[in-house]
Design a protein with these regions (language model features):
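Short acidic loop-to-helix transition motifs that present clustered carboxylates
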Residues: 84, 106-108, 162
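Short, glycine/charged-enriched secondary-structure capping and boundary segments
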Residues: 28, 53-55, 113-116, 145-147, ...
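Short glycine-centered, acidic/aromatic-flanked micro-motifs in structured strand/loop junctions
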Residues: 15, 133-135, 159
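Conserved residues at beta->alpha junctions
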Residues: 17, 104, 135, 165-166
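RNA substrate-binding interface of SAM-dependent RNA methyltransferases
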Residues: 2-100
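Active-site/ligand-binding-proximal alpha/beta "capping" segment
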Residues: 96-144, 152-155
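Residue-level recognition of oxygen-bearing side chains
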Residues: 22, 84, 138, 166-167
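Structured adenosyl-cofactor binding patch, chiefly the S-adenosyl-L-methionine
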Residues: 140-186
Length: 186
């Protein structure tokens, strides 16, 4: 991994713990897309059994390593220990931009948000972006309100409701396209 193929934007994916092998796919494809760090997250709707069973960090970090090699990444993203929702709320302040894809986001998408930030000349200060994706079953309305109060931007990913393992890919791709290197250099 000698080349620097990293994006100027660091993306931190706060992923509501999914069932079965979905986290493997999330880590593999998210690594290919340029995610910097994966933070498994325990929310109200996370299956209770998953909270005690998340013991596959070594395996997920190996998946990240292999995906980083395959996609010629300069760094290997880290998969952290799971954190609780309260810790997510604390992280909102630490990042330049924090996005929450949500099915009830009233047609306010990532492109609209980025254009608004460009018009306000705030876009050049954005280097660290958090994306919070809920688990199967989605995000509680109370969690959305708490995230909004902390300054998170609630955004739509379109008319269709995406699976938990898809939403992070779409949000990351849109961010990389709008702010970084996925769309090429114009």
């Amino acid at each position: 991994l000698d080349l620097n193929n990293e994006s100027e934007i660091k993306v931190f994916l706060f992923q509501g713990l999914p069932k079965a092998q979905k986290m493997d796919l999330i880590v593999q494809k998210g690594t290919e897309l340029g995610i910097t760090e994966f933070i498994p997250t325990i929310t109200h709707r996370v299956d209770v059994k998953l909270k005690g069973e998340f013991k596959k960090l070594d395996r997920l970090n190996r998946i990240a390593l292999e995906a980083a090699k395959q996609s010629k990444r300069s760094i290997v993203p880290k998969v952290t220990e799971p954190i609780g929702f309260e810790e997510v709320l604390q992280k909102v302040d630490e990042l330049d931009l924090f996005l929450v894809p949500y099915e009830n986001a009233n047609n306010f998408g990532i492109k609209t948000l980025i254009n608004k930030l460009r018009n306000e000349e705030k876009i050049n200060n954005i280097k660290n972006i958090g994306i919070f994706v809920g688990p199967e079953g989605g995000i509680e309305e109370e969690e959305i309100e708490q995230l909004k109060e902390k300054g998170a931007h609630i955004v739509t990913l379109g008319k269709r409701i995406l699976r938990t393992e898809t939403a992070g890919f779409v949000a990351t791709s849109l961010i990389q396209y709008e702010l970084s290197d996925l769309g090429g250099n114009d």
